[in-house]
């Protein structure tokens, strides 16, 4: 994996809390929403089809600030969950 650059985005996902998270680099907010929705749908599919008895997942979007990864917020201070709802209406 290439060294991250300032402004790079990545999705983080924990399929079963308290497991470690894994990360998926994304190019924009639409890609992030697609990945997060797909991972959530996959977990729900596994539950509904008795592949796993239950789950407690978590996920989100991070941005690299040049030194470390931080939770992504837009310029108005909204988190990704709030902004993702707006992406559906575009």
Task: Please name every model-derived segment.
Residues 19-30:
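A short, exposed loop/beta-hairpin motif centered on an aromatic-Gly-Thr core
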Residues 24-26, 37-39, 85-88:
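Surface-exposed beta-strand edges and their flanking turn/coil or helix-capping segments
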Residues 33-81:
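Acidic, low-complexity, intrinsically disordered interaction modules
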